[in-house]
């Protein structure tokens, strides 16, 4: 069995090497065609990642700008969040068919705080996430939004809409950040944790 251990480096993904790069004009692409590879190399900032990934919607854009402005430099809510997800990954082990980007994105949401984790810990199994085992009675609006977003990512449903994300009364700021971060994980996998506060374009 061949195991691919190749990992992109900043040198591999230099914009000057891209076919969309013109010497006197710079990048001529409307959207970066190699964003996933650049994220893996750790040269993409949070602003670029979010704006390239989340669909543009005027009211939501205003909220996204605040997320970008106040990005703490990590996708994790805190150290406890990181430890909970790492623990759950260790408990579940590795299963190639199960461990998709969407699976990890949902796990990220369901381990984001202690209450939602206790309510959904029994949902994790060898085949994926069985959302029907969650204990949602008397859960907070914040955690309910995270739960529905996690289910959307895994089951490709749309319980949480773009209109919901644009409404602070429906999706609070902390929930919005977590859902946006989970969307990045669903698109780019665990490499999304390499996203920085500022991209390499600020360091030239």
List the model feature ranges, each with a label.
Residues 1-138, 159-204:
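Extended, charge-biased low-complexity segments
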Residues 154-158:
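GHKL/Bergerat-fold ATPase module
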